[in-house]
Amino acid sequence: MNSIFKHITSFVFLAIPVSMSAAGDSLSVKTHIGYDVQDEYKTSSAISSVRGDELAKSFTPNLLNSLAGRLPGLTVGQGSDEPGVIDNSLFIRGMGTFQGLKEPLIVIDGFVTQYTDADGYLRTLLSQLMPEEIESVTLLKDASATAIYGLRGANGVLLINTKRGTNSPLKINFTAQVGFQQPTKMPKFLNSYDYANLYNEAYGYVNGGAQYYGTEALDAYKNGTDKYLYPDVDWYDETLRKTAEMYKVGLNFQGGNDVVKYFVLLNYLGNSGLMKRTEDLSDKTSNQRYNRYNVRSNMDVNISKNLSAHITLGIAIEDKITPGGTDAGKNTDDLFNRIQSLPPNSFPVRNPNNSWGGSSNWSNPLANIAERGYWRQNSRNINSALKLTEKLDMLLPGLSISDAISFNSYYLGYSNRYANYE
């Protein structure tokens, strides 16, 4: 076979068009500074911001993950990517100590929206928002930027402003996305043969050189001659899938006129976990899944020449199911602890008669997923506000007075369904 090699030299000429324009467009960018909206170039405080359209480029069930790397000075730590579990940590330029808190103050549409959940953890509505309903996220970092919040802003402040209506014809936007989650790297465990050899080595140190596994067992593990008596099980591979699916469908309406401006959003997010699908294992269905429904309705109404009303309503409904059927089913910690601690030769996944392997109901992690039932958690979060603004131009041009009221409601319920198996 003859090989032909060709050396190709190419020259590329790049022409870059250069034009000059007035600086007015770039200087007209507005940024929120807590109590007002100001031209970005006029702000001397340490402030950074990101638009909601930029956040929407990252398809993730948790909005907090989208903020990572997009706001200088903000550190986002991810404790878990389990569907429906919000375990992020937020730090702005390190940690503060006011009241023992480390997280920044979260302000959504002018109101502080942090609450303590049933487990005593500090939570915020930010994690339940969708990028499509966010206008901008602004990070206030230094003392001059956070001064109006006093000690509460000691750890920095995150300002989130949701989208509102515009004086324009109706715009309808529909989005549909499908994505997949995949572990960055799965741990590799010893097979039964290597495990038995190392076990013999450790056993011999404390038992005068005696061997726990004999030659017959070692040969069976090595050659795989009897998968029931001498099993070799990769519990990660047996219990988990390679990928998890994500779905998102959204519809929003935006528009208005001189009297009424509106923004309405409907959104659905679905996320399945990495656990094996239970219908593939038994006749019961308790698949791990997470569903979230978001509704937003923001309206601005000019009641009269001087009086205007601003109505904000955001609703997030969550439904989470985790197989397991016990209190440990609140999350997957128990499952991962089990599959990491089980030796590969402990027992087969199924016995010769197709019953589940294991010496007790709690031993087989795959059986627990398929047969033990499920833990279901529901939450409802309502965030609403009404703001009235009266212009007082007759007293002083540009003078106005505003009053606002906010109502937040958070509901959390759960149910536990479990059963034994043979």
Predicted regions and their residues:
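Short glycine/proline-rich turn/loop motifs
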Residues: 229-232, 363-369
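Transmembrane beta-barrel strand/turn architecture of Gram-negative outer membrane proteins
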Residues: 133-136, 146, 153-183, 259-348, ...
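Asp/Glu-centered strand-loop micro-motifs enriched in Gly/Pro and often flanked by an aromatic residue
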Residues: 236-241, 369-376
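Short, small/polar-rich motifs associated with maturation and membrane association
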Residues: 1-295, 309, 357
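Secreted/periplasmic carbohydrate-active enzymes, especially glycoside hydrolases
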Residues: 1-2, 371, 421
